[in-house]
């Protein structure tokens, strides 16, 4: 499953949409979209754009949310994370 993952960051949304479409077009039946922190809303946008505009035969199979502890100089910070799994019908 790791090879079919798209990690969402600060790039424009369409870059990640293209990455997901490329995964599906290369034969993947499931693609995982992962994001942390502020990129979570961008990951949701990616999943919705793929489903509504490009691949109507793709559904959300699972959504996992979690909290990760990040150690920094100021101590530990909690960062939210999401994983959206898209699968072909």
Swiss-Prot record:
Which Cys pairs are S-S linked? none
- One of its Pfam families is Alba
Its principal location? cytoplasm
Q: Which UniProt keywords apply?
A: Chromosome, Cytoplasm, DNA condensation, DNA-binding
Localization, UniProt: Cytoplasm; Chromosome
Cellular component annotations (GO), alphabetically ordered: chromosome; cytoplasm
Molecular function terms, GO-annotated: double-stranded DNA binding; RNA binding
Q: Which InterPro entries match?
A: Alba-like_dom_sf, DNA/RNA-bd_Alba, DNA/RNA-bd_Alba-like
Q: Which GO terms describe its biological process?
A: chromosome condensation
**Coiled-coil ranges from the UniProt annotation:** none
Q: Which SUPFAM superfamilies match?
A: AlbA-like (SSF82704)
Question: What family does the Swiss-Prot or TrEMBL record give for this protein?
Answer: Belongs to the histone-like Alba family.
Q: What does this protein do?
A: Binds double-stranded DNA tightly but without sequence specificity. Involved in DNA compaction.
Protein name (record): DNA/RNA-binding protein Alba 1
- Species, as recorded: Archaeoglobus fulgidus (strain ATCC 49558 / DSM 4304 / JCM 9628 / NBRC 100126 / VC-16)
Lineage here is:
Archaea, Methanobacteriati, Methanobacteriota, Archaeoglobi, Archaeoglobales
| Gene name of this polypeptide | albA1
